[in-house]
Amino acid sequence: MKGYCDMRGFLTFLVLRLISKKNISGEEISKEIEKRKGSKPSPGTIYPVLKYLKENGLIHEIQDTGKLKRYTITKKGERELKIATKKFISIFCDMKEEFN
C-alpha cells in the first residue's frame, strides 16, 4: 500500500481513524458515523471497507464475546493513517482557501 493514494476515499480514512481510537465493532463504527454525519451507513457500506482494510494489513479482527467481532489497528495501519491524515488535511486546507 502506498499511503493515501491507495486508500479508497474518505470513508476508508474515517473507519481506520475510528478503529485507531479503540477496538470497535462494525455496528459501533456505523453508529459513530451516524453521530457525525446524521445518517447511518448500511452494513453493505461498512463491511467492504473493513474487508479492504483487513486484506491490506491495516487492521486485525478480534473475536469478542459470542459472535461479536471487533477491529484493532496494526502498526502498518497506524503508519498509513498518519500519511492519509496529512494528505486529507492538506486537501481540505486547499479547498478552504479556494472557497474563502
Model-derived segments and spans:
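Short, hydrophobic-biased segments on the C-terminal half of alpha helices
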Residues: 47-52
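N-terminal helix-turn-helix DNA-binding core of bacterial DNA-binding proteins
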Residues: 2-45
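Glycine-centered, phosphate/nucleic-acid-interacting loop/turn motifs that mediate DNA/RNA or nucleotide
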Residues: 57
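Sparse recognition of residues in long alpha-helices and their boundaries
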Residues: 38, 45-46, 93, 100
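Short beta-strand "wing" residues that participate in macromolecule-binding interfaces
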Residues: 61
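Amphipathic alpha-helical dimerization/coiled-coil segments
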Residues: 79-100
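Basic, amphipathic "hinge/linker" alpha-helix immediately C-terminal to the N-terminal HTH DNA-binding motif
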Residues: 65-85
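Short, Lys/Arg-enriched, disordered terminal segments
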Residues: 1-5, 97-100
